[in-house]
Amino acid sequence: PHGIANALVLLHVLRYNAAEVPAKMGTFPQYQYPHTLARYAEIGRSVGLTGKNDSEVFEKLLQKLQELMDTIEIKHTIKEYGVDEKYFLETLDEMTEQAFNDQCTGANPRYPLMSELKEIYLKAYYGEGNIPESGKAKEKKEEK
């Protein structure tokens, strides 16, 4: 279902968007400076989270979101839902292209490169920091 798919990529997308030095896209001059981290911290503070700085509040927000997902029994990875790895990797390029071309992508606070979208999908499938070397090598090869 759509909601579970959103939950599986949510934390990865939030972390991606919160980067303090994103690649600036010339076609989007309205993004004068990155302020997404501050906005996410504002959300965290509005629900009672505190911290020494925006980064700390943001990390606590991610923790709370993960706790919520655990409470409602959302698994941590796409793989845990039984999606076949071979099938996932065979369809990864198509999914990446569809995400890049989605009408909502242009409204994202950080305009992604296709390689970055692919990385988000890989993290959502394997889990943060668990992408096998074969997945990384394939990505690097395709970027050239």
Task: Enumerate the language-model features and the residues they cover.
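Proteins with a high burden of low-complexity, intrinsically disordered sequence enriched in S/T/G/P/A and R
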Residues: P1, I78, K136-E139
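Short, amphipathic C-terminal "tail helix"
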Residues: Y87-K144
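Gly/Pro-rich interdomain helix-loop hinge
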Residues: G3-E90, N130-I131
